[in-house]
Amino acid sequence: MKINTTDVRTAIYHSLQQWQSVSLLTFKEEYYDENADIKVSFVKGKHNDGWDFDGKGRILAHAFFPSGSMRGVVHLDYDEDWDFASLKQVLLHELGHTFGLGHSSDNKSIMFPWNSSSVDNVNQDDKNGIEWLYGLKNKWAKLSPPVTKPPVTKPPVTKPILTTVPRFPVPTTQVPIIQPRFGNPTTHSPTTRHPLQKIPIQPRFGHSNPPIRYNPPIRYNPKHPLSPPFKSIPNSLLNVVNSSITNLYVYFPNTWNSSIIKFN
């Protein structure tokens, strides 16, 4: 391990301060585990979380996303030769996972999955990611999406090979189906000038109540006589009623005797 408790606490403090400086998150140290949202510990080999360490080299640490029973947990491999710089860098990465960030495809990002000693600060992509999750540090700033993908349910692992753990949760909420505000239309046909309840139209195809459309009164215009398009209808009509199912037209001349005509 090769690192003392004071350096560990200082590395944790500085790592959290970096994330706090670019986000709306705030942190304070707790002395009791049950009060802490984030817990950092050194463990060896098998440690009962399904993600065993492999001794010195390769896997350095892992952390869990902020959901489930292991949320906020950071495990560091006790067998590694830690110093202040390496611990701070790994903590920056793993703490990002506890906030909900996955691996970044930006090789200058602290969330890039390959461990690089040249990257020891959060960059713009990291800032975009944390603001995407928790809001803008500056309320007047423009929110920019990060270049990474949503996280999967498994905890990301810091190791010297490229992994494909995405960053943000895959949305499951479906677009709501908008129901008609007033239900199905119930408005009846407009009332005509004369009662037409007893029109002798016979239904076809077994329909007992064929829909009937009431047309407004047709006034004769000498310039546009009705006889050319409707050769069976007199020039002077009072009203016409049409059934959309039977295709029957009932026309009313200037008398009360109705006539029924079918147009193909």
Swiss-Prot record:
<dbReference type="Pfam" id="PF00413">
    <property type="entry name" value="Peptidase_M10"/>
</dbReference>
<feature type="compositionally biased region" description="Polar residues">
    <location>
        <begin position="184"/>
        <end position="194"/>
    </location>
</feature>
<protein>
    <recommendedName>
        <fullName>Putative metalloproteinase 165R</fullName>
        <ecNumber>3.4.24.-</ecNumber>
    </recommendedName>
</protein>
<dbReference type="InterPro" id="IPR033739">
    <property type="entry name" value="M10A_MMP"/>
</dbReference>
<feature type="binding site">
    <location>
        <position position="103"/>
    </location>
    <ligand>
        <name>Zn(2+)</name>
    </ligand>
</feature>
<dbReference type="GO" id="GO:0006508">
    <property type="term" value="P:proteolysis"/>
</dbReference>
<dbReference type="InterPro" id="IPR001818">
    <property type="entry name" value="Pept_M10_metallopeptidase"/>
</dbReference>
<keyword id="KW-0479">Metal-binding</keyword>
<dbReference type="GO" id="GO:0008270">
    <property type="term" value="F:zinc ion binding"/>
</dbReference>
<feature type="active site">
    <location>
        <position position="94"/>
    </location>
</feature>
<feature type="binding site">
    <location>
        <position position="97"/>
    </location>
    <ligand>
        <name>Zn(2+)</name>
    </ligand>
</feature>
<keyword id="KW-0645">Protease</keyword>
<dbReference type="InterPro" id="IPR006026">
    <property type="entry name" value="Peptidase_Metallo"/>
</dbReference>
<keyword id="KW-0862">Zinc</keyword>
<dbReference type="InterPro" id="IPR024079">
    <property type="entry name" value="MetalloPept_cat_dom_sf"/>
</dbReference>
<comment type="similarity">
    <text>Belongs to the peptidase M10A family.</text>
</comment>
<dbReference type="GO" id="GO:0004222">
    <property type="term" value="F:metalloendopeptidase activity"/>
</dbReference>
<feature type="region of interest" description="Disordered">
    <location>
        <begin position="176"/>
        <end position="207"/>
    </location>
</feature>
<feature type="binding site">
    <location>
        <position position="93"/>
    </location>
    <ligand>
        <name>Zn(2+)</name>
    </ligand>
</feature>
<keyword id="KW-0378">Hydrolase</keyword>
<dbReference type="InterPro" id="IPR021190">
    <property type="entry name" value="Pept_M10A"/>
</dbReference>
<keyword id="KW-0482">Metalloprotease</keyword>
